[in-house]
Amino acid sequence: MTNSRRHIFERICAKAFQSSLTCSIFGFTVLLILYLLDWKRIAQVPGPNLLKDLEFQRAWNDLEYISSLPHPYNSKQNEHVRSYILKSMRELEATNQSYITVIDDTLTNITFESTDNDTLTYFEGDNILVKFEGKSKDLFPILLSAHFDSVSTGYGATDDGMGVATVMAIARYYAKNQPNRDLIININNAEEDYLFGAKAFASHKLSKNVTAFVNLEGAGSGGKAMLFRSSNGHVSSAYFKGNHYPLASILGNDFFKRGVIRSQTDYIVYEKMHNHTAGLDIAFYENRDIYHTRKDDINHLMPSSLRHMMYTASNAVKNLLNDSKSDLTKFRKPMFFLAFGKYWQLNLPIYQVLNIIFAVICPIVLLLTLIRFPSLYEQLKKPRYTVCFVVSCIFVSIFDTLTVLLLTWINPYVINSHTGLILALFYLTNLIALAFSFRAAATHSKLSSEDLSSIEIVFIWYAQILWYLVFIVSVILSIYFQLGSTYWVTLSYLCTFTCCIMTIIRINYFVDNVVTTQTTHEEDALIGSSINTSSHQHYGSTLNSTPHRRNSIALSNRAHVKLIDNIWTVIYFIFNVPFPVFLCYDILVETILPAGSQTLTDSVFSSKLYKLVIFVVFLSLVNSGPFIFRALSKKSLAVLTMLWITLFVQALSVNPFTESAPLKLSFVQMYDMDRMNNTVYVKNISPFTQDVLSLNPHFLFSNGSCNTSLCYYESTDPDFGGLKTPMSIHIEREKHQLDISINSGSKWCYVDFNTSVFFEAINGNSISGMYSSVRMGQRSFYAPYTLNLTITEVVKAEVTCLYDDIHEGIIPAYNTFVEHLPSWVAGVKASTGLLKVKSSIVI
């Protein structure tokens, strides 16, 4: 009775796992449930109870004030925000805690040369510094930094209002709790203008002994704050230690390093201070399309975003302050990644050494197994198998390439706001191409039923060979460019390697069961013979019971063998498919697409992002080839093909820009005082810019036109409050000595000469150098710029002063430009200065 029940159970299981599709669905479903449960945990943010010591509501109130209006460095609102922050920090000093010092840094002036040594930059800093003297005098200080200025076209709630609110909250906490080592806070200005605030701090005396820093930034708008960059593994561990809500990606390190993300943060300044300070760059990165736009306001934020930054930043600062090591710079480059719901950390050199070990040991192990199992080697070297796999991969590559070419030709910016659509399309493209090409190649090769039974194992080995080639390339890139973002290739390769080992175990198991299979065939023959013999017997005779018994045993053995085979298929699938799929999907959804999809309009269009995404998708699905080849029927392929056509047509026709992911058009107005004319320049993203400007009356009435990069038209003159000459230039000469005084009501002015001249001083600060251009930024709107020069010949110069304050009514052309934009378009600054007023002089 027991054997009978066992046989029935095995037959039911074999029936349940009767096809590769059923096995695949089973394995995939189990891991998908585990992944979704873990993803839900990862997606969580800290609750209000975890931030009681940081006074979250007060931080939110700070954020509301800071982001109430645009406050670029060159605006009156910037001064109001600065006064608010300084007053709040002065309150900490007023608590009479002797270890707190607040510094209103209006004394630091810096000068530096451009890389070609021909342009001089002069900048007057006005950072707000707070020093908390630590209990231990032997440990080097830690720096915490954020910038309080915004761009001229955005309210700066994420960039960087939340960073400033977080810094202020942490400052209040340490005003009540003296840190173990010195903590220096730099709430700096003019970050949006070439990181000048951080550069000013780097020349301040408080920066001299800083050993590590935490920089808070906003490279997107809202979402969760991610650890984008880290200098070494030791400071990285400070971020992860005790952090129950981490979000980090080593891809950020490499994206900034390789220029994939073009914008920069104060991190690059602090890291190069003195003896290469170690640090962390924690930044918001989602919704990059409303980054630097008027939608970067508090109405488009969730309190959970601020809570997450406050929690992760305070945790990192606490761990750095409590670190017993004085010098935190003498550690190796970091390496961290998310796998199995946990962040794993190791040093980059160790990761590279492990890669080399895997690259050598893994193929040796597999070659030794092939020597042990020559029958498998005979199968692997069959030309029809090799041709089937190679032709299939070539077909998939061609299909992927054609898909990308058509997509970027007809609707190149569709990925900007429809990343989910493009990702689904690319996954379906590769799934269909793999299934169709493998099936077609196998049919053309006329594989026998015996070949089909072994092709699953063969294709697993071929996929391993493909991954090995990709792995070798990734190892070379990792070593040559010092990249850690190739970890997903390493882990995926190890999955295929493990699966190959599992096939060896199965082959060994199958050999042990050859007798069972042979017995089944023999019994089949006996059954057939017995049935023919029994046809002449009477019903119910004793001879008739023997065939029935043998038939039952044979069917039971078949069910057992079928069950074992299909269980192995599930095991292969679990080891080979889900983890690479989830790993690749995670880096695409969490990092590559959020960081890259909304940057296509920032520079000249390139299809590199599409190619990268579809290549990663192909690699994530290539391991499924051995399964979908036999699992998907012709009807299934037909249904998937119809779905692919639907998605492809939608991707070609959908509007690439939406209200939540708008097209960003950069704006600048040039006002020439000599000719008394002005021209507005708008970045030309064809064909959208011309369609948008056709709604602007100034573009139509002035017969505006466009070239390949810019559209330009005449617009409303700037309003300087009744002044016809907003900029006055006064020159005093004495032999070869020349003093130039510029009054402009602007914090930014440039002077460009037609030849190099000798600079003696700027605003009383000694220079002594030959330059053809100077960029000047000063604290006061109304103080004149003074240049002391020495010249020996006639010199021509062009003076340009910049204006950014859109709420002072100085730039009505920008207000008109924004008023006539459709909801799916946003205006942004082209560079420092929405308005540039210039005048020429001859000396």
UniProtKB/Swiss-Prot annotation:
CDD domains: M28_Fxna_like. Residues 1-16, 369-386, 439-456, 506-566, 630-636 are cytoplasmic. Its cofactor is Zn(2+). Coiled coil: none annotated. Zn(2+) 1 binds at H147, D159, E217. One of its GO terms (biological process) is proteolysis involved in protein catabolic process. This is Vacuolar membrane protease. The lineage of its organism: Eukaryota, Fungi, Dikarya, Ascomycota, Taphrinomycotina.
